[in-house]
């Protein structure tokens, strides 16, 4: 669903980058919705970043290359109002614990499920928080420590 929405948004010549967020104004890298929503960007915007960036390390925090300056036109997608992502969960795949949680979800829900299905599943299985809890603070610490230099010329 969100892939289609992002593709549609990128057809607008006034948009270079689209991602999920909890605000229409300011990017929040720790918002849980990011684990569910892919980001999309135009090839022209990516080429421009590659030309202007001052660092070779662009792995951690790549979205901020698009959101931390006025060069790129960014659009944020808000989650549907009835979708509430619990703070004690994360849905990215950065650590082995993330993958372990993903395997549990997929083994129970199969390959075709929605965000709502996942949220209902974790509500019915609150013990799953124990899988992911050790990496919540670790991710925040690692993110701050390893975030790329977003400076561009």
What are these regions (language model features)?
Residues 95:
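Short, conserved phosphate/pyrophosphate- and ester-handling motifs at nucleotide-, phospho-/glycolipid
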Residues 1-89, 100, 104, 120-153:
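Conserved core of the sugar-phosphate nucleotidyltransferase
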Residues 107-108:
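A hydrophobic, small-residue-rich beta->alpha segment in the mid-to-C-terminal subdomain
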Residues 55, 111-112:
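Alpha-helix boundary/capping and short turn/kink residues
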Residues 39, 92, 111:
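Residues that recognize and position ribonucleotide moieties
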Residues 117:
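Structured alpha/beta or helical-core interaction and ligand-binding surfaces enriched in interleaved
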């Amino acid at each position: 669903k969100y892939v289609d929405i992002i593709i549609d948004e990128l057809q607008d010549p006034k948009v270079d980058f689209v991602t999920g967020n909890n605000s229409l104004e300011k990017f929040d890298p720790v918002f849980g919705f990011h684990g569910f929503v892919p980001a999309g960007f135009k090839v022209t915007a990516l080429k421009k970043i590659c030309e202007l960036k001052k660092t070779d390390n662009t792995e951690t925090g790549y979205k901020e290359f698009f959101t931390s300056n006025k060069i790129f036109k960014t659009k944020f997608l808000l989650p549907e109002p009835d979708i509430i992502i619990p703070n004690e969960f994360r849905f990215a795949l950065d650590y082995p614990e993330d993958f372990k949680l993903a395997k549990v979800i997929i083994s129970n829900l199969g390959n075709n499920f929605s965000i709502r299905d996942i949220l209902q599943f974790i509500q019915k299985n609150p013990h799953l928080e124990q899988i992911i809890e050790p990496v919540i603070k670790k991710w925040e610490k690692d993110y701050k420590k390893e975030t790329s230099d977003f400076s561009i010329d």
